[in-house]
């Protein structure tokens, strides 16, 4: 009987060790859980960025206002008869 109890105790200790410290144990679970959370956060940022880019593409495909806005902001172009005025911030 004593041998059986010692055997069960050793088996329980072995199972507990593998649960806490072994492959796919609690430590791996917590590490992977935090990695998944950070990846989900990164994915949310990328989804938002993709939605903005998709909206820009649709605006460029459907109308001239988006093209005109980009030409003004990125290339510094102006329409005929317009006067371009740039206000610079005061130096400190």
From Swiss-Prot:
<feature type="coiled-coil region">
    <location>
        <begin position="40"/>
        <end position="73"/>
    </location>
</feature>
<keyword id="KW-0997">Cell inner membrane</keyword>
<keyword id="KW-0472">Membrane</keyword>
<dbReference type="Pfam" id="PF04977">
    <property type="entry name" value="DivIC"/>
</dbReference>
<comment type="subunit">
    <text>Part of a complex composed of FtsB, FtsL and FtsQ.</text>
</comment>
<dbReference type="GO" id="GO:0043093">
    <property type="term" value="P:FtsZ-dependent cytokinesis"/>
</dbReference>
<keyword id="KW-1003">Cell membrane</keyword>
<dbReference type="InterPro" id="IPR023081">
    <property type="entry name" value="Cell_div_FtsB"/>
</dbReference>
<feature type="topological domain" description="Periplasmic">
    <location>
        <begin position="22"/>
        <end position="92"/>
    </location>
</feature>
<keyword id="KW-0131">Cell cycle</keyword>
<comment type="function">
    <text>Essential cell division protein. May link together the upstream cell division proteins, which are predominantly cytoplasmic, with the downstream cell division proteins, which are predominantly periplasmic.</text>
</comment>
<dbReference type="GO" id="GO:0030428">
    <property type="term" value="C:cell septum"/>
</dbReference>
<dbReference type="InterPro" id="IPR007060">
    <property type="entry name" value="FtsL/DivIC"/>
</dbReference>
<feature type="topological domain" description="Cytoplasmic">
    <location>
        <begin position="1"/>
        <end position="3"/>
    </location>
</feature>
<dbReference type="GO" id="GO:0005886">
    <property type="term" value="C:plasma membrane"/>
</dbReference>
<keyword id="KW-0175">Coiled coil</keyword>
<comment type="similarity">
    <text>Belongs to the FtsB family.</text>
</comment>
<dbReference type="GO" id="GO:0032153">
    <property type="term" value="C:cell division site"/>
</dbReference>
<feature type="transmembrane region" description="Helical">
    <location>
        <begin position="4"/>
        <end position="21"/>
    </location>
</feature>
<protein>
    <recommendedName>
        <fullName>Cell division protein FtsB</fullName>
    </recommendedName>
</protein>
<keyword id="KW-1133">Transmembrane helix</keyword>
<keyword id="KW-0132">Cell division</keyword>
<keyword id="KW-0812">Transmembrane</keyword>
């Amino acid at each position: 009987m004593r041998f059986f109890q010692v055997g069960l105790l050793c088996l329980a200790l072995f199972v507990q060790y593998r649960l806490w410290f072994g492959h796919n144990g609690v430590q791996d679970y917590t590490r992977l859980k935090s990695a998944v959370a950070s990846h989900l956060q990164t994915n949310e940022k990328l989804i938002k960025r993709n939605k903005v880019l998709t909206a820009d593409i649709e605006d460029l495909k459907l109308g001239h206002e988006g093209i005109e806005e980009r030409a003004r902001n990125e290339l510094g172009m102006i329409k005929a008869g317009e006067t371009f005025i740039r206000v610079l911030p005061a130096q400190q």
